């Protein structure tokens, strides 16, 4: 994989990544495995959830889709290098402010503020 070549060619302080939970899942990969693989290279993470409407994947507020958030957040804490968790939702099924509030409330219920 190209990413493996990048990891071998550059030190963590020379090359970092912004991991996007939705797109890792959409690509068919395991989010926690990628967090572990890039553990010392992810200063920020885009938190996006994935739900299914009919047969189609859609973006959802964090906590309303099928991503294992408690496991993801525990894995990030274990790796200990991520400074910023950024709630992001490219496409909203309702008001973006409502979606942001739902994501915030869910993450707050897990102790994140």
What is the role of each PLM region?
Residues 1-19, 23-113:
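Histidine-acidic metal/acid-base catalytic patches
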């Amino acid at each position: 994989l190209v990413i493996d070549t990048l990891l071998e060619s550059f030190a963590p302080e020379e090359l970092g990544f912004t991991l996007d939970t939705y797109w890792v899942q959409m690509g068919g990969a395991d989010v926690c495995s990628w967090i572990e693989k890039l553990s010392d290279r992810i200063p920020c993470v885009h938190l996006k959830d994935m739900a299914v409407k009919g047969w189609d994947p859609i973006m959802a507020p964090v906590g309303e889709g099928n991503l294992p958030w408690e496991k993801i957040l525990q894995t990030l804490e274990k790796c200990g290098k991520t400074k910023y968790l950024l709630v992001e939702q490219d496409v909203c099924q309702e008001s973006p402010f409502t979606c942001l509030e739902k994501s915030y409330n869910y993450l707050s219920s897990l102790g994140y503020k």
